[in-house]
A protein has these predicted regions:
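N-terminal "arm"/small-domain region of PLP-dependent enzymes with the aminotransferase-like
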Residues: 19-76
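Phosphate-binding glycine-rich loop
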Residues: 84-123, 137
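N-terminal export signals
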Residues: 1-30
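PLP-dependent enzyme catalytic core of the Aspartate aminotransferase-like
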Residues: 334-337, 346-375
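PLP-dependent aminotransferase class I/II
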Residues: 230-313
Length: 375
């Protein structure tokens, strides 16, 4: 049961690549053969791990080969290998290299921003719930967090967030699409909000799930960085590129801000992670394959939830947020009993559950578990 309508047109966003027909989509899927059961056996875990919004098909074969071909340089520190990746990302985003901050996953980017701007009493405005690594880390260094509840439709309350900005506000945090709700802010609303807020403070836009957006021509807020606005954007290689275990991400910010963030990095990213990220950016076929498989898996989740009459949010990500109509702790235990691991609770929405997309085998495992629970 869909909570609100969603467009499923133009499901594939690509830079320089579009899949023009269904036959081409099938060709892409057929030409890339990767293990279907990898996630079920990882670390000896027998569960279908649908809890962390990972890409079960990654990394691509080209990335795997690049990693193996560069094993000989693992004995060297990675300083001399950064420049090529920085340039590749800068070209991808359409900015100069001094706008880019390499981070160990987008999580490090979130944390160093929280440290840099939330230090000793800085105020941060954020939606609630959201992916809160930045806020949690900033609190450890004395930041004051103002949480603005999402609306009844689980959207960012941009009006409420704007009203909370004052002279002590050091950062406004936006997650778009939002984790865990999967909702997407209308492009014009987001641009207007960011422009207005950036006149008063720094705006951070977490775009970890940006690649999954299907709305035609939906803009990245990197465009505002290019205009010189006080905006920081985070991106990750952990989702569509399938590199979660290598911890690769980056920030895009104006050079003056980027320099301050670089000074607060805990360490530098590893050589093989940089090699993998550089190759992943150029592998458009795997990018398309991953988006196609995510679309198929998400539709399978929708069908399962619809058949059971469960309310869910149409998602612009690689997960679906739904109401199981049961106490979440007990529900998660029931799922695990039948071989499926779902996401953690997301207070204050403790009557909602987040399930990640997976392989079709895992989606069938999820459906079977749900039928056992609700049958």
């Amino acid at each position: 049961m869909i909570m609100q309508p969603v467009s499923r047109r133009d499901w594939l966003r690509l830079s320089g690549l579009a899949l023009a027909s269904l036959s081409i989509q099938h060709k892409v899927s057929a030409n890339i053969q990767l293990p279907e059961q990898t996630l079920n056996t990882i670390s000896g875990n027998p569960l279908a791990r649908l809890s962390s919004n990972e890409n079960p098909y990654g990394p691509s074969e080209k990335v795997r080969k690049a990693i193996m071909d560069n094993m000989d340089v693992v004995c060297r520190y990675p300083f001399s290998y950064q420049d090529e990746l920085l340039q590749a990302i800068a070209d991808w985003e359409g900015v100069s290299k001094d706008h880019i901050v390499l981070t160990a996953g987008s999580t490090e980017g979130l944390k160093i921003t929280g440290l840099t701007l939330g230090w000793k009493g800085g105020e941060i405005v954020a939606p609630d719930p959201t992916f809160n690594s930045l806020m949690v880390y900033a609190e450890q260094f004395g930041a004051n967090i103002h949480k603005i509840p999402v609306t009844a439709t689980l959207d960012h309350d941009l009006t409420g967030m704007a009203a909370k900005i004052n002279g002590n506000t050091k950062l406004v945090f936006v997650c778009n699409p939002n984790n865990p709700t999967g909702t997407l802010i209308p492009a014009n609303d987001l641009k207007a909000f960011c422009k207005q807020a950036a006149e008063k403070t720094t705006v951070f836009v977490d775009e970890a799930y940006f690649d999954f957006i299907t709305t035609p021509d939906y803009p990245s807020m990197v465009n505002l960085v290019k205009q010189g606005l006080n905006v920081i954007v985070s991106r990750t290689f952990s989702k569509v590129y399938g590199l979660a275990g290598l911890r690769m991400g980056y920030l895009v910010a104006n050079p003056a801000i980027a320099s301050k963030l670089i000074d607060n990095r805990v360490a530098f990213v590893g050589t093989l992670g940089m090699v993998a990220a550089r190759e992943a950016l150029s592998d458009k076929a795997f990018y398309a394959f991953s988006l196609l498989k995510n679309k198929e898996a998400k539709e399978h989740i929708y069908e399962t939830l619809d058949s059971l009459g469960l309310v869910y949010m149409p998602s612009h990500t690689n997960f679906v947020f739904f109401k199981p109509k049961r106490e979440l702790g007990a529900f998660n235990k029931e799922l695990e009993k039948w071989g499926v691991q779902a996401g953690r609770p997301f207070p204050p929405l403790i009557d909602w559950s987040r399930i990640s997309t997976g392989t079709m085998a895992e989606m069938q495992q999820f459906r079977a578990a749900m039928l056992k629970i609700y049958g």
